[in-house]
Amino acid sequence: REVAGDARHGDFEAQQFRPQWRDPARLAQLVDAIIDLANDGLDPRDYHVEVLEAFRTELGAATMLADGEQAALELLATDPLLLARYHLYLGKVAPQTRSPQWNFASRPVSVERGFEAVTAALASGRIQQTFELARPQHAWYQRGREWLKAYRALAAAGGWPGIPDGPTIKPGMNDARVPVLRAR
């Protein structure tokens, strides 16, 4: 899914149609920020991460991309920057499509402020920060990100330690499995 062409055109116009993604370090920041979206429960593959990784490798090996490749990179890199900010700010799924009783209003969206944030991120080289500013700032959301990251690390390390089979352990019982259970 791509952001509407008008939105990208507005961003390119704000940048005076200058290429923004020639610097491999800037592209690396974008790729890293997109990969980190997994900690928000978003799938980095929805934001062209594989193609951007390939461009990052190619850009690191070449001094310049061909004009057509550079134009493709501009579109492919700007699109997820705008789209991910939108998803972080408002969510990826319209909640009323999942629950007809949904009665919360969405946060207001300012396209101009979004472009300003993207322009500032590109000018300062702080790609991750533009995602940080779009995320919900609630403490519970930040804790959720931390928990998701921790659980994914636990799963990558092999998951919870197993508990040997045996009878149900009830409060006050002594059992050789209790220390293993406590360690979990």
Q: Where are each of the predicted segments found?
A:
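Auxiliary tRNA-acceptor-end handling modules of aminoacyl-tRNA synthetases
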Residues: R1-R184
